[in-house]
UniProtKB/Swiss-Prot annotation:
It comes from Roseobacter denitrificans (strain ATCC 33942 / OCh 114). Its EC number is 2.7.7.6. Disulfide bonds: none annotated. Keywords: DNA-directed RNA polymerase, Nucleotidyltransferase, Transcription, Transferase. This is DNA-directed RNA polymerase subunit omega. Gene3D superfamilies: 3.90.940.10. The keyword Transferase applies. Pfam families: RNA_pol_Rpb6 (PF01192). InterPro entries: DNA-dir_RNA_pol_omega, Pol_omega/Rpo6/RPB6, RPB6/omega-like_sf. GO terms for cellular component: DNA-directed RNA polymerase complex. GO terms for molecular function: DNA binding; DNA-directed RNA polymerase activity. NCBIfam families: rpoZ (TIGR00690).
Length: 117
């Protein structure tokens, strides 16, 4: 069982932080059932993924693309129709009620209420 360190992989992926992200993603893929491309040699998934990167059986560019795709989420929003949206928001309730009273009738009632009529 050969010991794999980050230094073995730095020439393939120069940024150590990116290397850790790629190796962790590949380890998750192996845990999910993807077949390792190197002999396991009783190693755990993170060590196997680092060996795959060091031996270039997994391309860093391919791993990077798969990592990006796994983090992209599409959220579908089911928006209601415009007419239904107005009803849902209570637009019908905001309309004033129709008055059957004319201006003349309103003035007469106001004057009567004030005692002038």
């Amino acid at each position: 069982m050969a010991r794999v360190t980050v230094e073995d992989c730095v020439d393939k992926v120069p940024n150590r932080f990116e290397l850790v992200m790629l190796a962790a993603h590949r380890a998750r893929e192996i845990s999910a059932g993807s077949a390792p491309t190197v002999n396991r040699d009783n190693d755990k998934n993170p060590a196997v993924s680092l060996r795959e990167i060091a031996e270039e059986t997994q391309s860093a560019d391919d791993l990077r693309e798969r990592l990006i795709e796994s983090n992209q989420h599409q959220i579908e929003v089911d928006e209601p129709e415009e007419d239904a949206m107005a009803l849902l928001m209570g637009a019908e309730q905001d309309k004033p009620e129709e008055d059957s009273m004319s201006e003349e009738m309103l003035l007469r009632q106001l004057m009567a209420a004030q005692g002038q009529g």
